Amino acid sequence: MRKHFGTDGIRGRANGIITPELALKVGQAAGVIFQRGDHRHRVVIGKDTRLSGYMIETALVAGFTSVGMDVLLLGPMPTPAVAMLTRSMRADIGVMISASHNPFEDNGIKLFGPDGFKLNDELELEIESLIDGDMRRRLAGSRDLGRAKRIESVHARYIEFAKRTLPRHVTLDGLRVVVDCANGAAYRVAPETLWELGAEVIAIGVEPDGFNINRDVGSTAPESLVQKVRELRADVGIALDGDADRVLIVDEKGQKVDGDQLMAAVARSWKEDERLTQPGLVATIMSNLGLERFINGLGLTLARTAVGDRYVLEHMREHGYNLGGEQSGHIIMSDYATTGDGLVAALQLLSVVKRRNLPVSEVCHCFEPLPQILKNVRFRSGEPLRADSVVTAIAHAKDRLGQSGRLVIRPSGTEPVIRVMAEGDDHALVAEVVDEVVDAVTRAAA
């Protein structure tokens, strides 16, 4: 049973769940586990722009150096940049201090192995066992303590990496781009990358103060970006989240393009170019049925996983896919990155736009999403989904939807909530089905 790690590292209220004491122990435990071989061991640490990042970074440095690991400090950098630099700098482990799209009061710790991939369940459980144990006998001697060093050239390294995901002949000349960096980790690298590729760049969400990350900006609050795109008559808007591992696109009309539409546009282009390593892509159970029908219409298949980019990536690696993601904008292109990379995904989409010489709206709106309704049911205890009345209601709902829709019911991984989602061609039927299941779950949870 997991105590500290969730589906995306350790996350919670800063100085509540994520305390200096916990960060110290995480550094010590991870340092002990990844000290293999007889070379000098080191860890790469990046963070987003939250005020609590300083506190957590300092505690992690103390933890890693106390067990003999050297620390390379990157400062504010996107999560995918930390994963890339972990590999590039031959580090034994990478750490990202971020709570992604959450408000500034929260923070988190994500860990990457030397290959740049997030740690598997077994390693996370091993780290948990050490966190809760006695580390005193694992500490390094006075002569063997690690050293910490701040690296200055990391922004240029990541910018060059992002640019190299495009062929050298591809530029963004002639595109007016508004980029919203959520006052987060990409506030320096994203505008600079786009400018170096030739775009006219208007940057918003690039004034972090420790408190304003994700506040009314970024991929989870794109209204200001929509307004700016329309106001400036820009060709495209790009919204990243606080750690820049997800992206949302806004077309020249101010219409939002979610992860499903983005994956559809890229999949169509990659199929034409014979770039897909498997005849399809990987998405989650929450992706719209319209995406599945569009992908099937291309002669491709859509594999579905549980919610969470780690499950998408696991399926991609196991079955050899190079494209996958989530409706929320976590897009994984494994030819380039070991995790979701919002900037790289945006660049790949813009390369399709440039090649086809069409407006973003014509490239990105590949299918009409089916009506989708999601409702949450809170419960205090027990397992309401096991109740006979709920099982019967779910079976009846699926029969009513038939082949024209889908029903997805799942417990939240972070709170006592059951999510009921249905989609289908008939909006009225979808609404009825959701209400019936919600009523049954609510009664069972009472």
From Swiss-Prot:
EC number from the UniProt entry: 5.4.2.10
Catalytic residues in the record: 100 (phosphoserine intermediate)
Residues that bind Mg(2+): 100, 241, 243, 245
Alphabetical list of InterPro entries matching this protein: A-D-PHexomutase_a/b/a-I (IPR005844), A-D-PHexomutase_a/b/a-I/II/III (IPR016055), A-D-PHexomutase_a/b/a-II (IPR005845), A-D-PHexomutase_a/b/a-III (IPR005846), A-D-PHexomutase_C (IPR005843), A-D-PHexomutase_C_sf (IPR036900), A-D-PHexomutase_CS (IPR016066), Alpha-D-phosphohexomutase_SF (IPR005841)
CC annotations in GO: cytosol
Keyword Phosphoprotein: yes
Free-text description of this protein's post-translational modifications in UniProt: Activated by phosphorylation.
Function recorded in the entry: Catalyzes the conversion of glucosamine-6-phosphate to glucosamine-1-phosphate.
PANTHER family xrefs: PHOSPHOGLUCOMUTASE (ALPHA-D-GLUCOSE-1,6-BISPHOSPHATE-DEPENDENT) (PTHR42946:SF1), PHOSPHOHEXOSE MUTASE (PTHR42946)
Name of this protein: Phosphoglucosamine mutase
Origin species: Methylorubrum populi (strain ATCC BAA-705 / NCIMB 13946 / BJ001) (Methylobacterium populi)
